[in-house]
Amino acid sequence: MSLISKTAGIVIIGNEVLSAKTQDTNSHFLCRELRALGVEVRRISVIPDEIETIGREVAGFSRDFDFVFTTGGVGPTHDDVTMAGIAHGLGVKVVRHPDLEQRLRERHGKNINEARLRMAEVPEGAALVGEGSLYAPVVRIRNVYIFPGIPKILQERFDVIKERFRGSPYFLQVVYLKEGEGVIASFLNDLLASFPELLLGSYPVLDNPDYKVKVTLESKDQSYLSRALQKLLNTLPKGAVHRIEGN
């Protein structure tokens, strides 16, 4: 059994996140959405608004993963250097995209200025995705998708383009157990020995009187998952299972 997942990396850009002025919720949203689309998020990085750092991180992610998602640093102010950083890392210039410039001029009219026009600057060779559905479409260069840091705007834009990332889904079963990890560890080890491609997780629960551990079993092969679940249930101590949930 082998169903290969597309992989993704997420780069959260912003001094305000690192200094705790803003709490990042974008990575959680993207992880949840991408998982539902069958994409495996392999890494999340939070970095400052520095051109060299952005360039190095995004270039490395672009080599390592099928998709890269960046958030933050695309506004009109002095610390919005994401476009310049990505361009630097990918070895291209920053240019003004004519379609974005036109949209900005139409929106702001006589109030347009150079600060606002900075939001039309993109890495050379970048394309726009989600056009027609969004006031400001998502900028993509190679496998890098560049999003703003404002959660509401990011979510709206991702929702428009998310189907392009869809792969085969993950199937999930969750088993809530009355026994602690010390009791069940050997059963989980045996399960992985029999089902080495199973994605198996074990999470202690401290504040629930009904169960002590939540065990998750995931696979892109539903039959494989069903067999693994049945083996686990057959080997656990009698009465250990509180309940089972899954898709």
Explain the meaning of each model-derived region:
Residues 5-8, 63-65, 123-124, 135, ...:
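Short coil/turn connectors at secondary-structure junctions
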Residues 28-80, 85-88:
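N-terminal small/polar loop signature for handling phosphorylated ligands or for N-terminal nucleophile
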Residues 53-56, 80-165:
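Proline/glycine-rich low-complexity loops and linkers
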Residues 15-16, 73-76, 151-153:
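Short glycine-rich anion-binding loops that position phosphate/pyrophosphate groups of nucleotides
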